């Protein structure tokens, strides 16, 4: 039995790095929290669509035809990837009518989105993953802080802002620290703030979640 367990653990360690496990755990936790908050008909925002995985999850949660997903990214390739991801995986084509994708910096939001009208805003910071992506194009701490400040004005009661911070690349650790500084200053009577951080893995991703009371 012990030999089988060791063999299984060795196989497990070859397949997954600890950083990868932390990332997958955070993604699962993030989606669980979002799924508990979002209801049919809500407005949600994916502020940095990347490869489209969060946008796909949000689109699936928005059952019915009255909800709305806004998705943004600074790179056209990310918008194209996300649109393709949604078209290939959504069960019905008419769900695309609920989706608005556009190329823009995440630090500002369209004026049509009214204050206190959004149930969830999702961030996946850093650069666009993939072997062919330009790793020099990434989110910047100053833009992210401005974006989060604006996002907090949009979130409705009972809503959630989630920020996945990646600390392993150049500038990532500093960006994560700036995010946590902003969140730590929020009024506890209005907000519940959590940092989900593997304490013994300083370069692993950290998930920051902010709930509007």
Regions found by a protein language model. Give the residues of each.
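Conserved beta-strand signature within the Rossmann-like core of class I S-adenosyl-L-methionine
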Residues: 147, 154, 158-165
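Helix-to-beta-strand junctions that scaffold the AdoMet/dcAdoMet cofactor pocket
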Residues: 39, 63-64, 155-157
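Mobile active-site "lid"/loop adjacent to the S-adenosyl-L-methionine
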Residues: 122-147
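Class I S-adenosyl-L-methionine
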Residues: 169-213
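S-adenosyl-L-methionine
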Residues: 2-43, 47-61, 80-116
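Glycine-centered, small-residue-biased loops immediately flanking beta-strands
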Residues: 42, 67, 159
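Conserved SAM-binding motif I beta-strand of class I
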Residues: 68-73
């Amino acid at each position: 039995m012990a030999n089988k367990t060791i063999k299984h653990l060795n196989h497990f360690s070859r397949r997954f790095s600890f950083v990868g496990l932390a990332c997958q755990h955070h993604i699962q936790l993030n989606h669980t929290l979002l799924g508990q908050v979002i209801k049919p008909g809500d407005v949600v925002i994916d502020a940095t669509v990347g490869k489209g995985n969060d946008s796909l999850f949000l689109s699936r949660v928005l059952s019915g035809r009255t909800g709305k997903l806004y998705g943004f990214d600074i790179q056209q390739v990310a918008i194209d990837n996300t649109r393709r991801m949604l078209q290939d995986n959504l069960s019905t084509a008419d769900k695309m009518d609920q989706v608005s994708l556009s190329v823009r910096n995440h630090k500002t939001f369209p004026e049509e989105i009214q204050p206190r009208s959004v149930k969830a805003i999702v961030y996946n910071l850093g650069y666009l993953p993939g072997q062919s992506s330009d790793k020099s194009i990434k989110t910047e701490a100053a833009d992210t802080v401005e974006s989060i400040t604006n996002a907090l004005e949009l979130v409705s009661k009972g809503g959630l802002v989630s920020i996945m911070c990646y600390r392993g690349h150049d500038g990532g650790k500093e960006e994560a620290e700036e995010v946590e500084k902003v969140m730590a200053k929020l009024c506890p009577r209005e907000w519940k703030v959590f940092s989900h951080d593997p304490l013994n893995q300083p370069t692993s991703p950290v998930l920051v979640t902010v709930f509007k009371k």
